[in-house]
Amino acid sequence: VKTERIFLAPTFGWEMSSRTTLRFEAEYMYDRAPIDRGLVAIGNGVAPIPVSRFLGDPSRKLETHHGKATITLWHDISNMFRWRTAFRTAVTSSRYSSLESNFLVGAESDGILNLARYEIPTTVQSHYLQNELHGNFTTGSIKHKTIIGIELGRENSSATASGDFGGDTSTPGAFSYINIFNTNDRLFLNPALTKFSDASTQNNILGAYFGDQVDLLDNLHVHFGGRFDLFDQTITNHPDDFTATSSQNNKTDSAFSPSVGVAYQPWKPITLFANYTESFAPQSAGSRSINGNLFNPERGKSYEGGIKYQAFGGRLRSTVALFDTRKKNVLTADPLNGFFFSVATGEQRSKGVEFDIAGQILPGWDIIANYAYIDARVTKDLLFAEGSRAPNSALHQGSLWTTYFFQEGVVQGFGAGIGMYAQGKRNGIFQCQDPANCQAPFEMAGYVRMDAALYYRKQEVFNKTNLLAAINFTNVLDHRYFSGAQNFREIVYTGAPFTAIGSLKFEFH
């Protein structure tokens, strides 16, 4: 299976004066790769076949062109105020041409996987403009760090979807298939396609926001702020092979989302903190429902509190935090109509505890570690079972990464890193209140993945140029694991096998 990828990301900075700087960042990516839907579930787990097995037609590809550019201007108005203007534009054009897993035909033990043919060209454009005023001043004995900003945005998306829906599985030879246990047993057809969706969407977004971080005392800090969002979304459904006429739906909504936080330092190495935030986000322009209607915005509330501790003069830092997050209208793949369409869940809740530690143990020796216990469940819904665990969310997960750079001698600048990432078992799909509306549940096993890296860094390798060379190794033990599922038994994504990626970074100053 061959993948082609080109990625460029140039960045330029210009000090126009002692008070004004301009920064330009660009990004271009070309990607052409087979459409890999991973493996399939059998029984309560994933099929016992190699993760390298490709269950589709490798000659069918997803071809993507993506470009993004950002221009940011900073201007120091005075010693207390700074102005920022940023404009970002992005365009993505893709062609999705697949013969991919659809469903198992007959007994699962036979391994006959029906394949569906799809053609989906898509174009997405987004343009955003931000203007912000940053402040750093005092009122009496109270210090303030403030931000006031306004954001304008527009997103446009258009997509046409055609497919054969897997063909006629009741007639041998009338549908494409592959045997998951023996991929030499297969039949790839090129059937006539039916256009089942042709839609374009436009989102217009206006946001205004403010924030103030107030130092009431040297050991007492308060933050408060908020954001007001107004958006207008229009979807136009063009004629397809099921609908002969066009239709248009429009949705306008607004919300104010506050945030507040407090941090108190009873003793120098210890900080107690608590935060409350609300969120409001229009659904992306590319989201599609089976009936062509628009989705309500995603809304959320989050509570967090914990303790931070610093040791050895701040060289080692750790945090323990409790959190409780609730979100409404979270989109997921439609279990009744296929993953090209979405449905919104009523409410999902995630609560748990996080622990992390980071710092320098000895000169040149750094460590980062974290652990999280996350209980993510559906709490309110008409389709999915209330109280059921959300897919792809493990109760336990954590990571450890440590690096060492030699500080002197002929090996100065050389370094190495080693670490691990672990996840517990996860559900593959949502459970439905009525089992007839969802596929049978299954689990993805927990795993531990080992990673490593080699480094070389040198200051002033050329005039005013620093160098960082790295080789990163992922899954060095080539362990079999699964990164997630897409709410279907036939789409279980495999984790990457042993991979080595080299990089060179030059930093000009």
Task: Please place each PLM-identified region on the residue numbering.
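Structural signature of Gram-negative outer-membrane beta-barrels, strongest in the C-terminal barrel
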Residues: 15-17, 124, 143-155, 162, ...
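Membrane-embedded beta-barrel scaffold of Gram-negative outer-membrane proteins
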Residues: 74-76, 80-88, 92-100, 265, ...
